[in-house]
Design a protein with these regions (language model features):
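Gly/Thr-rich phosphate-binding beta-strand-loop-beta motif of the actin/hexokinase/Hsp70
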Residues: 107-137, 345-359
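Phosphate/oxyanion-binding active-site loops and adjacent basic polyanion-contact surfaces
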Residues: 80-91, 253-271, 294-302, 333-340
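Conserved phosphate-binding loops in N-terminal lobes of ATP-dependent enzymes
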Residues: 1-57, 156-294
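Glycine-rich phosphate-binding loop and adjoining helix at the ATP-binding site
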Residues: 288, 292-341
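Charged, amphipathic alpha-helical linker segments immediately N-terminal to NTP-binding catalytic cores
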Residues: 38-84, 298-299, 316-320, 324-328
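Conserved phosphate-binding catalytic cores of ATP/NTP-utilizing and phosphoryl-transfer enzymes
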Residues: 87-112, 320-356
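Flexible phosphate/Mg2+-sensing switch loops adjacent to catalytic phosphate-binding sites
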Residues: 133-161
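Short secondary-structure boundary/capping segments
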Residues: 132-136, 142-144, 299-309, 347-351
Length: 359
């Protein structure tokens, strides 16, 4: 992670100071003229400098790619990292500090009090949030966030594409908050569906893509099991039925190798990474809608999976501040018909006369 990378660079910095002194003496002595006979001495002097350059490059890429690598959100610029009023949530350790020119930012400064609405659909999911009084929709898994926006972009396909299962699980089951997943190991939403549609004759690719995750959630333990296989190794994984795994209110989520692979939790995490993007702020309250006839036990399982996935999209330094973890909530707020009516009635110039009749 970023902290470990910088700890390594502290050691390299010490070697670097010594090497620059030796390099200065070496150049003054004229010994460099003996190259290649003095190749060993040259390499000995330059090795820490080369290592430092590589470490700086790796650290820079790690930090600028923090959002792009897992969710293909735009890369961070050096200006964002070094801005006194910007910086990184990931580096926050309880007080302001600057690490190699990068500012640590308290994520609590970016918490938004406004709720996020999620319509988790069978084929697609719609996410809406309040941006300083302006209601906006979100796009998830699009190839280019800077491309012209289309209305269809907001219908986010409820799909996951498994490219490298072992690599995915190694990270997902070892890091609870903001695990550094790689988009090249697991893709979501628009890009996953685009790959499926453009390669419909490819059985290997088709078996790696899980469509209509909401339908999978309806399966019971006695139903036919769903299997997926990844694209890299052909690893076959049988998905267990969705179970009720609610995080404990106010407690940090723990993960481990025995955790089941839950597509609903994974999908919710992707949504959360976009919802809680640096440009949008951090959100603690989420409202979901469900079909009227959806079984109560299935709703509870989906809500639990979304609680886990959305909470895991928050920065660890934020949930470490327990007051914010206590405020985190994912609730069922309305049925889909009621939510639709609430949106449509103002447009039609209608007002409810009895509150109970529309909720």
């Amino acid at each position: 992670d970023a902290e470990a990378m910088y700890a390594n660079m502290d050691d390299i910095n010490e070697q670097l100071k010594k090497s620059f002194g030796r390099l200065h003496d070496w150049l003054l002595s004229g010994d460099y003229l003996l190259y290649p006979a003095d190749k060993t001495a040259k390499e000995d002097v330059l090795a820490p400098i080369i290592a430092y350059g590589k470490a700086c490059s790796a650290a820079s890429a790690l930090l600028t790619d923090l959002d792009w690598r897992p969710a293909r959100l735009p890369k961070l610029s050096p200006a964002q990292l070094q801005d006194l009023h910007g910086g990184l949530w990931e580096l926050w350790r309880g007080e302001p500090e600057v690490v190699d020119g990068v500012h640590a930012r308290n994520p609590a400064l970016d918490v938004r009090d406004r709720p996020v609405a999620i319509d988790f659909g069978t084929s697609s999911t719609v996410v809406a949030y309040d941006d300083h009084g302006s209601k906006k929709l979100l796009r998830v898994g699009v190839r280019d966030f800077d491309a012209p926006i289309r209305a269809a972009d907001f219908e986010n396909p409820t799909a996951l594409e498994f490219v490298d299962l072992p690599a995915l699980l190694a990270v997902w089951q070892s890091e609870a908050y903001r695990p550094m997943l790689n988009w090249d190991d697991l893709r979501c939403a628009h890009e996953a569906l685009d790959h499926y549609r453009s390669n419909e004759g490819d059985a290997t690719l088709a078996s790696s893509i899980l469509l209509k995750i909401k339908q999978w959630a309806l399966r019971e333990a006695h139903d036919h099991r769903v299997c997926i296989s990844d694209q890299i190794l052909g690893t076959v994984h049988t998905l267990p039925p969705l179970t009720l795994r609610n995080p404990v209110k106010g407690a940090l989520i723990q993960v481990g190798a025995d955790d089941p692979l839950d597509p609903v939790e994974l999908y919710a995490w992707f949504l959360g990474m976009v919802i809680n993007w640096r440009r949008h702020g951090l959100h603690l309250k989420y409202y979901m809608s469900f079909p009227v006839d959806y079984p109560r036990e299935v709703k509870d399982k989906i809500l639990a999976a979304f609680r886990r996935g959305l909470q895991r999209s928050l920065p660890a330094p934020l949930v470490a501040q327990r007051e914010y973890l206590e405020r985190f909530a994912v609730e069922e707020r309305a049925s889909e018909p009621a939510a639709y009516a609430a949106c449509a009635m103002p447009t039609l110039g209608l007002s409810p006369t009895d509150r109970k009749s529309v909720v």
